[in-house]
Amino acid sequence: MKLLAVRRLFRIQRVVIRYRLDDLLFDQPLLPWWLASLRLLMPWRWLPRKPTELSRGARLRLALQDLGPIFIKFGQLLSTRRDLLPPDIADELMLLQDRVPPFDPKKAVALIEEQLGAKVGEVFSRFDVEPLASASVAQVHAARLKTGEEVVVKVVRPGLKPVIAQDLAWLFLIAKAAERASADARRLHPVEIVGDYEKTIYDELDLLREAANASQLRRNFEDSELMYVPQVYWDLCRPKVLVMERIYGVPVTDMATLADQRTDMKLLAERGVEVFFTQVFRDSFFHADMHPGNIFVSTVKPWSPQYIAIDCGIVGSLTAEDQDYLARNLFAFFKRDYRRVAQLHIDSGWVPANTKVNEFEAAIRTVCEPIFEKPLKDISFGQVLMRLFQTARRFNMEVQPQLVLLQKTLLNIEGLGRQLYPDLDLWSTAKPYLERWMRDRYSPKAVFGNLHSQVEQLPHLAGMTRDLLERLSQPHLHDPQLPERRRQGDRWALRLLGAGLLGGGAVLAAGAAETASLAAPAAWPAWLMLAAGLYLIVRQ
């Protein structure tokens, strides 16, 4: 293992030298003297340099390709962090393709038989040894069940975990060194990015997780005209093997075939937007890897086209609070109410509570106002979110991983929609859906349903209120970097406090009604408690 690690280190060093990636660090201005002096200890920097026409982004992309699939997938993750990376580097990393040669089919068969505890011939009436597709984590084979259903069998590459662990160790080492060496690097949070990647890559190794995600999405869109998700055959799913229904559709980028079957392209593009907002706001569970390779179009009703989604390994979800603030931010942005946008960021806890609203508002206006020079139909929701994240980072916003997944997915959906139908007006398509969601969220039925669920938490009210008051009495807990989970806890405590006030007010009101009139002065405390409780619940 140590020998492999040393060999890998030399491989990384050769790639760094070949593409002069050290320039990305050492050619930065205002380097600490001790770091700048390290250049003298690198012999290759003394040698004459061959002129190159490659940009820094292209050199980084080629280096990641040379380092193999784990680094390629890391580069793909980086390409989604446009709130962090310079545009030239992000654009180049978007070109990375997760395509690797297939592994030996005999190994795939052996792994399937080991996982299922049966011979392939006992489970499938036909199994194609030539894979349909091959990527860095798994490859896919076509097969037919004994009962006649056509399926695909996804198999994790054997021996992948040690390789991933080794490459992740080097990525963490590089990230930590970059954070120590450069203020610009610290602003990009490289260790945090590698940590997010570690979670993502290990999640992708567990095919039971992908099967569960697919089942949830299928249930969410059952009998829907918008999207179809293939059936999972749970009896044949294991941590390293996934068996799903085989679908036959047109790749969403195959414009010629879609045109030949007279697909309604405008409706298809609009339904893509509706699929996104349905997942985010109705279900709070969204497919977060909706690039064109994972999306097909059904051939059944071209006049009423339906999407088919595959590869559900990466999903995202939003809290009710994030859903609410996201919708309000979009409405405020399109009204050019930048003060409202700034205040919403502060209220949501996305930026520290001590942020100066006027300064934040001015920064948002400076970044976002040029966007409105374009026609409304050309404005990108994904770009709006990216610009807001970039601005908010200057005010110490910690962008939650789920919001990054959301922004990445939105960019994919937008790009796809405008490729299908260039005149797609995203805001006109999304606005009615958002308005309907906001109306439903604040309808009397929803408010009282929310109240009922929170009244059930009344037994915990005393303890949570005491904890909240203790935290508020300790100044050091007002740190701008207060973890999100503590902010969420505070919100829940305030909701429960509101529920308690409502309950107490109802008791007082009932007593006042028996002894006097609800309009009498004796009933005023009850009305005050009811009003305060309702305010706390709705406000939170």
Curated annotation (Swiss-Prot):
Record-linked SUPFAM superfamilies: Protein kinase-like (PK-like)
Entry similarity comment: Belongs to the ABC1 family. UbiB subfamily.
Metabolic or biological pathway, per its Swiss-Prot or TrEMBL entry: Cofactor biosynthesis; ubiquinone biosynthesis [regulation]
Name this polypeptide is given: Probable protein kinase UbiB
GO aspect biological process, one term: regulation of ubiquinone biosynthetic process
Residues at which ATP binds: L132, A133, S134, A135, S136, V137, A138, Q139, V140, K154
Lineage of producing organism: Bacteria, Pseudomonadati, Pseudomonadota, Gammaproteobacteria, Pseudomonadales
UniProt keyword annotation of Nucleus present: no
GO MF term list: ATP binding; protein kinase activity
Record: active site: D289
Gene designation per UniProt: ubiB
Root EC class: transferase
Ranges where the Protein kinase domain occurs: 126-494
Keyword annotations of the record: ATP-binding, Cell inner membrane, Cell membrane, Kinase, Membrane, Nucleotide-binding, Transferase, Transmembrane, Transmembrane helix, Ubiquinone biosynthesis
PANTHER family: CHAPERONE-ACTIVITY OF BC1 COMPLEX CABC1 -RELATED, PROTEIN ACTIVITY OF BC1 COMPLEX KINASE 7, CHLOROPLASTIC
Predominant location: membrane
Subcellular location: Cell inner membrane
EC number(s) from the headed UniProt entry: 2.7.-.-
TM region(s), chain numbering: 24-44, 496-516, 518-538
Job description of the protein: Is probably a protein kinase regulator of UbiI activity which is involved in aerobic coenzyme Q (ubiquinone) biosynthesis.
HAMAP family: UbiB
Organism per entry: Pseudomonas putida (strain ATCC 700007 / DSM 6899 / JCM 31910 / BCRC 17059 / LMG 24140 / F1)
Topological category with respect to the lipid bilayer: Multi-pass membrane protein
Record-level GO cellular component terms: plasma membrane
